[in-house]
C-alpha cells in the first residue's frame, strides 16, 4: 500500500542514476572512433583532472564529473580486449558501486564485468582500489581476465595470493587495482601491525574496496575473527583424559544438556560430580589444576562437532569444513582448545594450542575503508544489517533479460529416509527427460548418501563436496552441470563464480583439453603433497622412468573423458600436439611452476593482446577446440532449453533464506528457462531446532506414510517462521559480536596508531619523555595525598620509588621536596627526569650515534606487543565472565565496556612504566664499542 503511495524506493534510486547511463550511451559513438592509443591516452587526461583536487570533497566532485566518460572508455576497452560490452544494467551497477553501496545482481548478470567500471574510475586517483573475492582462484581469475581491461588502459593491476612473500605483496599492493581474498587482506593488515620496521609493512592506507559476494564476507563470515596466533605448550594428556570423561558422561543420564541453538553444552550438578569423581579431583575449577575448560571443550567436540559435517579427517589431521561454502579450510583451526579436543576425540595427533597475538573481525576490518561497496545476487534479506552495521544501502539492479525460472512449492516428508528416496526418484525422472539437475546438500555425509542412492538406481552423476578427491575438479564439475541429463550433487554450492551454462560450457572444456595436454609436459614435478596427487606405484628401483622418484608425488591433469562432448578431429589434435611441443621447446621440459603455467593457459584462453608466440599458438588451437565443442554443444543447448532448462533441488532449508536464494539463483540465468524445488522432512535440523513443539505435534497428527509428501500452508508458514527466527537469532549474535568487538576495535585503533607512529620513528624522544613525566606523576599521586598536611606526605618512599625507575637520580633526597607544593613537586620531578634522560642519551649515543632512537623504538614496540597480547587474553576472559552478570540485572555489554576500558588504561600505564624502566636500565654492551671502533 505504502509502496503504491510513495513509489518503490529502489526504483526511485535507479531513476536518479538513469541520466548518467544516458550520458554514457551518448558518448559511446565518439569513443568508438578513437584508436587504441587515443583510448589509452584518456587515462592520462583523467589523471590530470584529478591532480587539481586539493581536498577529498574536490576529488569526489571531479570523479563524478568524469564518471560518464570514464565508464564509456571502460566499456569500449571491454569490447576491444574481452569482446564484452557492458549492458545498461551493468553501467547502473557500476554507478551504484562507485556511490559506496551494495548492488544486488542476479547470478549470471556479469558482476565481475561490472566491477571494472568503479575500479578503473577510483584507480585513477592512484590511492589504490581493492577488489575482494572469496577465494584465491577467483582473485586470480579476475586479475587475469578483467585485469586485461585495466592494463590496456594503462593502470597497474596487482594480485595477492596465499604463499606470496612480503616483497611480492608490497609490490602488488602499490598497484592501482589489487585483486585479493578477504582473508589475505585482513591477515596482511594484522601482520603490518606486528611489523618491527617500516620495510616489513606491505599495505598502503586503505582507500576504496569492492567486495564480490559481499553477503558471504560481511554476513556469513562476520562472526569469524581473523586471528594470528603463536604456540603455547599445553599438556596433551589433559585433552585425551577429557575426551574419555566426555565419552563416559551421558545426555540420557542428564549429566549435561546440549543447547543446539547457542551451540553450547551445560553440565548439570550430577555431571559435575561425576566428572570430578572420574578425574579424582575436588573441583573442576581449581586454578592450580583447572579441568573445566578441557571437559567443556570435549563435550562440545562430542555433541556439536560432527565428522564429515563440521570437519573431515585427512592424513591424520582434523580439517575444518566451511559451513557456508562446503569447502575444506586447511590451515585454519578452531581456537581456545576446541580443535585439540576434536583431535583427542578422533584419536589423531594433538597439535599445540595457540595464543592470540592479533585479531580483528571482518566487520571491523572492512569498516577501516573510507569507501566500501559490494556485489551479490542476494542481499535484500539482510538489508537492515548492512545499513545498521556497515552503513551500506542495498540497491537491486534489474536483470538484463526477464527471468525464466519457476520456483515450485516445497514438498515435505515425514521422515528423512522418505525425503531422500523421493529426491533420488526426481533426479532419475529429470535424467530420463534429458534435463540437467543440480542438487544442493548441506553436508559431505548427505551428499554421499544421495550418491549411494543414485548409484543403486544406476543414475550417472557427479559429486562435489569438501572431500579432497572432489575439490580439484570443482570448477570442471560445475561447468558441465548444464549438460543434458547431467546430475550434479554439490555441498552448499561450492563453486560460486563458475557459471552453469545449459548444454555445457564450451570455453571451459576447451581450456581443460589444453591443460590436459600441456601441463604434464611443462609443469615441474613437486615434492610436496598437494591435493589430487597420485603416487607413482609399481615402479621398481631398477627401471625407474627418467626423472621419476618412486616416492615422489606426480600430479595428474587427466580429465574424465565423459566431460568432453565430442572427440577432437585428428587435424585439431595434431595442431594441439604441435603447439604443446613448441611450448616445451620455449619454456623447457617440465621446468615451470604450476601456477605460472595456469596463468599462461588463462591468458591463452582469453582475447587480450599478447606478444608471446607460444601463447599466440596456444590461443589459436584453443579457439579451434572451442569451435568444435561449440558446434556440438549448441544442439545440446537447444535440447536442454526445450526440456525446461536446469532443475535445482534443495534438500534442506538453510538457516538463512539468502543461502536458499543463492541455490535457486543457479537456475534461469540470463533469461534461460529453469525450475527449483525444495524437498524437506520434519526431521530436518531447521525444523527440529527452531520449529519447536508445534512441528513435533504435527508429526504425530500426520498419520501418513514416510514417502508421501505433505503440503500444508501451516507447515510452510512454520518453515518461514523458523527461518526468520534463525535469521533474527544469528543477526542478534552478529550484532552482539559487533558491539563487543567495537569496544576492542577502539582500543585496537588506538594501540595500532601509537605503534605505527613509533614504527615511522616520529618524535620518539618526546614520546618517551612524555611517558617518563606521566610515570613521575603516577608516583607523586601514589605517595602524596593533597588532603593531608605536607608533614604527613611519604616523601622518602616517593624518592625511593623514583630511584627504582631512574637510577641516574641517585642524588635525589626527600629534603629537596620539603617546602614544595604538590604541583611544584610534579614540575620538579619533570625537570629531573628530563635531565636524567639527556644524560642517559649522551651515554648511549657515545657507543653509536643514533643508538638511543633505535633503543626507544625497540623497547616501545616490545612492550606494546607483549602487553597487547596479554590484554587480548584478559579481554577474552572478561567477555566470558560478564556474560554471567546478566543474571544480576546488569547489562553485560556496559560492564564489558567499562571494565575493558579500565584494563586498557592499566595496559597503557604498564607500557609507559616498562618503557621508562627498560630505557634507563639499558646498558649497551661494550663489545659493540670495540666492533664499532674497528669498523671506523
Curated annotation (Swiss-Prot):
Its EC number is 7.4.2.8. One of its GO terms (molecular function) is ATP binding. It comes from the Bacteria. One of its GO terms (cellular component) is cell envelope Sec protein transport complex. Keywords: ATP-binding, Cell inner membrane, Cell membrane, Cytoplasm, Membrane, Nucleotide-binding, Protein transport, Thylakoid, Translocase, Translocation, Transport. Its main location: membrane. It is a peripheral membrane protein. Part of the Sec protein translocase complex. Interacts with the SecYEG preprotein conducting channel. Has a central role in coupling the hydrolysis of ATP to the transfer of proteins into and across the cell membrane, serving as an ATP-driven molecular motor driving the stepwise translocation of polypeptide chains across the membrane. This is Protein translocase subunit SecA. It comes from Trichodesmium erythraeum (strain IMS101). The lineage of its organism: Bacteria, Bacillati, Cyanobacteriota, Cyanophyceae, Oscillatoriophycideae.
Amino acid at each position: 500500500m505504502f509502496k503504491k503511495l510513495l513509489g518503490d524506493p529502489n526504483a526511485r534510486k535507479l531513476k536518479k542514476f538513469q541520466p548518467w547511463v544516458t550520458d554514457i550511451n551518448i558518448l559511446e559513438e565518439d569513443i568508438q572512433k578513437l584508436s587504441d592509443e587515443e583510448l589509452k591516452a584518456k587515462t592520462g587526461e583523467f589523471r590530470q583532472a584529478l591532480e587539481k583536487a586539493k581536498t577529498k570533497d574536490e576529488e569526489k566532485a571531479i570523479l563524478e564529473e568524469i564518471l560518464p566518460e570514464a565508464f564509456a572508455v571502460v566499456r569500449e576497452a571491454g569490447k576491444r580486449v574481452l569482446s564484452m560490452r557492458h549492458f545498461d544494467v551493468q553501467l547502473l551497477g557500476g554507478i551504484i558501486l562507485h556511490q559506496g553501496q551494495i548492488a544486488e545482481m542476479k547470478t549470471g548478470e556479469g558482476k565481475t564485468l561490472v566491477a571494472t567500471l568503479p575500479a578503473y574510475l577510483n584507480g585513477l586517483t592512484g590511492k589504490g582500489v581493492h577488489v575482494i573475492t572469496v577465494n584465491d582462484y577467483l582473485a586470480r581469475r579476475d586479475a587475469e581476465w578483467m585485469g586485461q581491461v585495466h592494463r590496456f588502459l594503462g593502470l597497474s593491476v596487482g594480485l595477492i595470493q596465499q604463499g606470496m612473500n612480503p616483497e611480492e605483496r608490497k609490490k602488488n599492493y602499490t598497484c592501482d587495482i589489487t585483486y585479493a581474498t578477504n582473508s589475505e587482506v585482513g591477515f596482511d593488515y594484522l601482520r603490518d601491525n606486528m611489523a618491527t620496521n617500516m620495510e616489513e609493512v606491505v599495505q598502503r592506507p586503505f582507500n576504496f574496496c569492492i567486495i564480490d559476494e559481499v553477503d558471504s564476507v560481511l554476513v556469513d563470515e562476520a562472526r569469524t575473527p581473523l586471528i594470528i596466533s603463536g604456540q603455547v605448550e599445553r599438556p596433551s594428556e589433559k585433552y585425551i583424559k577429557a575426551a574419555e570423561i566426555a565419552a563416559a558422561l551421558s545426555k540420557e543420564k542428564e549429566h549435561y544438556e546440549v543447547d543446539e541453538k547457542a551451540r553450547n553444552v551445560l553440565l548439570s550438578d550430577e555431571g559435575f560430580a561425576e566428572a570430578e569423581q572420574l578425574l579424582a579431583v575436588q573441583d573442576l575449577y581449581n586454578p592450580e589444576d583447572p579441568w573445566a575448560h578441557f571437559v567443556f571443550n570435549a563435550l562440545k567436540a562430542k555433541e556439536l562437532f560432527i565428522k564429515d559435517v563440521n570437519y573431515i579427517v585427512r592424513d591424520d589431521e582434523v580439517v575444518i569444513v566451511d559451513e557456508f561454502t562446503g569447502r575444506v579450510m586447511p590451515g585454519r583451526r578452531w581456537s581456545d582448545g576446541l580443535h585439540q579436543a576434536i583431535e583427542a576425540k578422533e584419536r589423531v595427533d594433538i597439535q599445540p594450542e595457540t595464543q592470540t597475538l592479533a585479531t580483528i573481525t571482518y566487520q571491523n576490518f572492512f569498516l577501516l575503508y573510507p569507501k566500501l561497496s559490494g556485489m551479490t545476487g542476494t542481499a535484500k534479506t539482510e538489508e537492515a544489517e548492512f545499513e545498521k552495521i556497515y552503513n551500506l544501502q542495498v540497491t537491486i539492479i534489474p536483470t538484463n533479460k526477464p527471468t525464466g525460472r519457476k520456483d515450485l512449492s516445497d514438498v515435505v516428508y515425514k521422515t528423512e529416509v522418505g525425503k531422500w528416496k523421493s529426491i533420488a526418484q526426481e533426479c532419475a525422472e529429470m535424467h530420463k527427460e534429458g534435463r540437467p539437475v543440480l542438487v544442493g546438500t548441506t553436508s559431505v555425509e548427505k551428499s554421499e548418501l544421495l550418491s549411494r542412492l543414485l548409484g543403486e538406481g544406476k543414475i550417472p552423476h557427479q559429486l562435489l563436496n569438501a572431500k579432497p578427491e572432489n575439490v580439484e575438479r570443482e570448477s570442471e564439475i560445475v561447468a558441465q552441470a548444464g549438460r543434458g541429463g547431467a546430475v550434479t550433487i554439490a555441498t552448499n554450492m561450492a563453486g560460486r563464480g563458475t557459471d552453469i551454462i545449459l548444454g555445457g560450457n564450451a570455453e571451459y572444456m576447451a581450456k581443460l583439453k589444453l591443460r590436459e595436454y600441456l601441463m604434464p609436459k611443462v609443469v615441474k614435478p613437486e615434492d610436496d603433497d598437494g591435493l589430487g596427487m597420485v603416487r607413482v606405484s609399481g615402479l621398481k628401483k631398477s627401471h625407474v622412468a627418467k626423472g621419476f622418484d618412486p616416492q615422489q608425488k606426480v600430479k595428474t591433469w587427466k580429465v574424465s573423458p565423459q566431460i568432453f562432448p565430442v572427440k577432437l578431429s585428428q587435424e585439431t589434435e595434431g595442431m594441439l600436439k604441435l603447439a604443446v611441443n613448441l611450448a616445451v621447446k620455449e619454456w623447457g621440459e617440465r621446468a615451470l611452476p604450476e601456477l605460472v603455467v595456469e596463468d599462461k593457459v588463462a591468458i591463452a584462453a582469453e582475447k587480450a593482446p599478447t606478444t608471446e608466440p607460444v601463447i599466440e599458438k596456444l590461443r589459436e588451437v584453443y579457439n579451434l577446440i572451442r569451435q568444435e565443442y561449440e558446434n556440438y554443444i549448441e544442439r545440446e543447448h537447444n535440447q536442454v532449453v526445450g526440456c525446461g532448462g536446469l532443475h535445482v533441488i534443495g534438500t534442506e532449508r538453510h538457516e538463512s533464506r539468502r543461502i536458499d536464494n543463492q541455490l535457486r539463483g543457479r537456475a534461469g540465468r540470463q533469461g534461460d528457462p529453469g525450475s527449483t524445488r525444495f524437498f524437506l522432512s520434519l526431521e530436518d535440523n531447521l525444523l527440529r531446532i527452531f520449529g519447536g513443539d508445534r512441528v513435533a505435534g504435527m508429526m504425530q497428527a500426520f498419520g501418513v506414510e514416510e514417502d508421501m509428501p505433505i503440503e500444508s500452508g501451516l507447515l510452510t508458514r512454520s518453515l518461514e517462521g523458523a527461518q526468520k527466527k534463525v535469521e533474527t537469532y544469528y543477526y542478534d549474535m552478529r550484532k552482539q559480536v559487533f558491539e563487543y568487538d567495537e569496544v576492542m576495535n577502539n582500543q585496537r585503533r588506538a594501540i595500532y596508531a601509537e605503534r605505527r607512529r613509533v614504527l615511522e620513528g616520529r618524535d620518539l624522544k618526546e614520546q618517551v619523555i612524555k611517558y617518563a613525566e606521566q610515570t613521575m606523576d603516577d608516583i607523586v599521586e601514589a605517595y602524596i595525598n593533597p588532603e593531608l598536611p605536607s608533614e604527613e606526605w611519604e616523601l622518602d618512599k616517593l624518592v625511593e620509588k623514583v630511584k627504582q625507575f631512574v637510577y641516574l637520580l641517585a642524588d635525589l633526597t626527600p629534603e629537596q621536596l620539603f617546602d614544595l607544593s604538590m604541583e611544584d613537586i610534579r614540575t620538579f620531578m619533570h625537570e629531573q627526569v628530563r635531565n636524567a634522560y639527556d644524560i642517559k642519551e649522551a651515554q648511549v649515543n657515545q657507543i653509536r650515534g643514533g643508538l638511543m632512537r633505535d633503543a626507544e623504538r625497540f623497547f616501545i614496540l616490545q612492550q606494546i606487543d607483549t602487553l597487547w597480547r596479554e590484554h587480548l587474553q584478559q579481554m577474552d576472559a572478561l567477555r566470558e565472565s560478564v556474560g554471567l552478570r546478566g543474571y544480576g540485572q546488569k547489562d553485560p555489554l556496559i560492564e564489558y565496556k567499562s571494565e575493558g576500558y579500565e584494563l586498557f588504561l592499566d595496559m597503557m600505564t604498564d607500557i609507559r612504566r616498562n618503557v621508562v624502566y627498560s630505557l634507563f636500565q639499558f646498558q649497551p654492551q661494550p663489545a659493540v664499542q670495540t666492533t664499532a671502533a674497528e669498523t671506523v
